[in-house]
A protein has these predicted regions:
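Phosphate-binding/switch loop-helix module in NTP-utilizing enzymes
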Residues: 210-257
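Phosphate-binding loop that captures ATP/GTP phosphates
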Residues: 155-218, 224-225, 231
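Conserved catalytic-core segment of NTP-binding enzymes
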Residues: 87, 91, 236, 240-241, ...
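C-terminal boundary of histidine-terminating zinc-finger modules
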Residues: 349-358
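Walker A/P-loop phosphate-binding motif and the immediately C-terminal alpha-helix
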Residues: 132-169, 189, 284
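A short, charged, Gly/Pro-tolerant segment at domain boundaries
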Residues: 371, 382-395
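N-proximal, solvent-exposed amphipathic alpha-helical segments enriched in charged/polar residues
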Residues: 14, 18-63, 95, 99-100
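Extreme N-terminal, non-catalytic leader segments
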Residues: 58-61, 68, 78-79, 85-134, ...
Length: 395
């Protein structure tokens, strides 16, 4: 620092020389404080989040790092519901710092930053609904509706605003599963319907509008029209996710829905057995055909838990969902159990994540929900709102 004094004195000002020394000293002090903070930021950004499948740096999740007392604090924003994730992430990041040689306590402020993601070409997201997620299967009987309702309820429990649309016109299940059988939605203006509420989510189904025992003897065009009306003429309000419980199969109805409804991502539900996997592959290829990204595979009835002794058995085989996910380069989002309690809870109108959120059988649903939302968070975001609307007028 000594060379700064002669330079200043040569200009005839001792005061300027002293001020120069003070400024240099202050800058050195700032740099000394910022260097450890930057070191902490680099370590945090290098953390590979197990749900996102990418580093916090790649996800641009680390918003701020600062010194706080004898340690550090960090503000982190993730693109999926973070309820219940704070303690797990805090412990993981503390370990990350220790590995990087930073021996100081860390406190994190964690929040969700759920954005709207891109949908099929020529379609736009629906109003205040950020993301429509379709839950589909190639065949019936694999537990798709149970997966869909627990997915929606798990997201709500983790802090998201969620709705569910029962798109199975021929066999609606959600009224029973949500404990809403016999209830009817209101219509204040006679044009739009208000969804029913259950366990913190909004719900709409053709089952709310017809008698439970009335068969829907409709042809395909009538079904797609009815579903389009249920989707577009319901006052959903602001939602982070709208889960669409799709009808089983891959026929004209499913294809038309996939083309008309702006879907941000699809979840394919299957069981481990080969016959279910064969149809699940058809469902996956259908979404690929209409440019809907498949977020991943959910293997339902992955294992059976005996209600008497707790013995675990793979009744329908093992590893089918994992093999299919690897074959098509998508994620395995979850392996869910076949448990008698799940059936009882769902039939009783209180699905597992609501009826027994702390039970071991509920944990796979919460994990599946977080993996699904994280898979969507890594997809391209919707940019349509940033472009101005162009109107051409003849003069």
């Amino acid at each position: 620092l000594s060379p700064a004094i002669p330079a200043a004195v040569s200009r005839g000002s001792v005061a300027e020389a002293l001020q120069s020394l003070i400024n240099i000293s202050a800058q050195v002090s700032v740099n000394n404080r910022e260097e450890p903070v930057n070191r902490v930021r680099i370590a945090l950004e290098a953390y590979l989040d197990p749900y996102l499948g990418e580093t916090l740096g790649a996800a641009q999740a680390v918003e701020e790092v600062r010194a706080a007392g004898t340690g550090y604090s960090a503000r982190i924003a993730l693109g999926f519901p973070v309820g219940g994730y704070q303690a797990e992430l805090q412990a993981a990041l503390a370990g990350q710092l220790a590995t990087a040689g930073v021996a100081a306590p860390l406190a994190i402020e964690l929040r969700s930053d759920i954005r709207s993601h891109a949908v099929q070409r020529n379609l736009k997201p629906l109003g205040e609904i950020s993301n429509v997620v379709a839950v589909a299967s190639g065949k019936g009987g694999v537990g798709k509706s149970t997966v869909a309702v627990n997915l929606a309820l798990a997201w709500a429990a983790q802090g998201a605003r969620v709705g569910i649309l029962d798109a199975d016109i021929y066999g609606p299940s959600q009224p029973l599963m949500l404990g809403l059988s016999g209830q009817r939605p209101s219509s204040p203006d006679g044009k739009r319907l208000r969804p029913l509420a259950s366990h913190g989510i909004s719900a709409m189904s053709i089952g709310f509008l017809v008698d439970a025992e009335q068969p829907m003897v409709w042809r395909g065009p009538m079904v797609t029209q009815a579903l389009t009306q249920l989707l577009g003429e319901t006052e959903w309000g602001a939602l982070d996710y709208l889960v669409v419980d799709m009808p089983p199969g891959t026929g004209d109805i499913q294809l038309t829905l996939a083309q008309r409804v702006p879907v941000a991502g699809a979840v394919i539900v299957t069981t481990p057995q080969d016959i279910a996997l064969a149809d699940a592959r058809k469902g996956l290829k259908m979404f690929e055909k209409v440019s809907v990204p498949v977020l991943g595979i959910v293997e339902n009835m992955s294992l059976h838990v005996c209600s008497n002794c707790g013995h675990i058995e793979h009744i329908f085989g093992a590893g089918g969902g994992e093999r299919m996910a690897r074959e098509y380069g998508v994620r395995l989002l979850g392996e869910l159990p076949l448990d008698g309690h799940i059936r009882e809870e769902t039939d009783g109108g209180r699905p597992t994540v609501v009826a027994a959120p702390e039970a071991p059988r509920a944990r796979p649903y919460f994990e599946m929900a977080r993996r699904t939302a994280a898979a969507l968070a890594t997809r391209a975001r919707d940019r349509s709102s940033v472009f101005p609307k162009i109107v051409v007028e003849e003069t």
